[in-house]
Amino acid sequence: VTTATATWVNREATAEELIPLIGKLHRENGVVLSIHGRSLVNKSVIELLKLHDFVSHIDGAPLNPAHTLELVRALAELNLGACSINIAALHKAHREAGSPELSMWLPEQLGSSVNHQGDQPKEQDVVLYGFGRIGRLLARILLERSSSPLGSGLNLRAVVVRKNGDKDLVKRASLLERDSVHGPFKGVIEVDEENSTIIANGVPVRFIYSSDPTTVDYTEYGINDALLVDNTGRWRDVPGLEQHLNRPGISRVLLTAPGKGDMKNIVFGVNDNVITDEDKIVSAASCTTNAITPALKVLDDAYGVERGHVETVHAFTNDQNLIDNFHKGDRRGRSAVLNMVITETGAAKAVSKALPQLEGKLTGNAIRVPTPDVSMAILNVKLTKPAGSAEELNELFRRESIDGELRRQVGYSDSPEAVSTDFVGSRTAGVVDSLATVVTDDSAIVYVWYDNEFGYSCQVIRVLERMGGYDVPSYPAK
């Protein structure tokens, strides 16, 4: 047996020891362990080892699984309450502190969560109105958290859809279970047709059939004070969405599309602080606005943005035709799988709803391309203060992705082989492709990849958590 093989076998053995410890902390304490935003919960041995190697792209060297095991064993002794812990950042902080005794050092770092095991975080009922691409991904994210009764916070109770035939529920369960882009559902799904219920990972989700939001009484299903997520895009103004708000059992509404009028458009991480208890209807903006606004904020905070143009190379969507057919929009009637289609986007102008200082400074266009998921935004901006070099600008984004305020929104890639499918399942709003960055005098061009389905859905969940008052501590504290 070679030395390399023996080392690999030891790493596998260490990862195998980690799995039950990570699972127990999640189930019994509501603790979510992660590595720079990538959850360790329900991961296989190989997935855990790949996540440890990923750290080299951020910190310059991989994270040793043995160090993680030492940390996790120590964490398991602290009777922690629900919280989120970045193991890579915690290990780095421990090393920089001189590697003191963990039993003494960890309680100082996690003080507010130590000896709080069993504390029940605020629970919030959630209803999904619609079950399309975004609706099903929101359901997946909510259900993957359900294995921890102490850390779920948001409880998916029901989905409202129009009935399409006798096998409607079975087909919807199949669509939740299998996805051509995002792969199989991570869990077990059962169908209870008699009670119009899908049971996913032991969680019953009632399917309510209705084509009119004004006819549903949610209290009849034991649902009270719920957050309703309208992911149909059918209504985008306050009067339309108030149809939900006026129904028994619903207290607030979140729209997964750009809102019209005076509705607050929220890009989590940028302007979620403006949400108040009085805001009964809120928009989570669009996938593209969520992808570009955090990156633009980083640029504006550091250098100032005088003006700019945003070009989005966007995956095709359900709104387009498979083959040429009539469409009310210009060019969108042409085949989505055979053509690049120039179209309009309101994402650039919508940025100002989250960053008012950029109002009137941005223009935008979009090109729909024949790929089902993952898009790219090209930010071409004139800066008030020159960035100096591409290396300086990239370092700014790299640091932001590690420990900045926008680390959950801004990702960073330095791979010379990265292509669009590599970003399927990305949980950040956007990922800066550092090798494509161009800086010339006071101009900069930044390329941002984004999973326009899953990455956006993660942002929607974050807004939901803020609206529901679900806010667990994150460590290490910034």
Where are these regions (language model features)?
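Residue-level marker of positions within ordered structural domains that often coincide
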Residues: A139, G233, G249, P258, ...
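Glycine-centered flexibility motif
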Residues: V170, S174, V181-P184, G233, ...
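C-terminal active-site/capping subdomain that shapes the small-molecule cofactor and substrate pocket
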Residues: I46-G118, G364, N380-K478
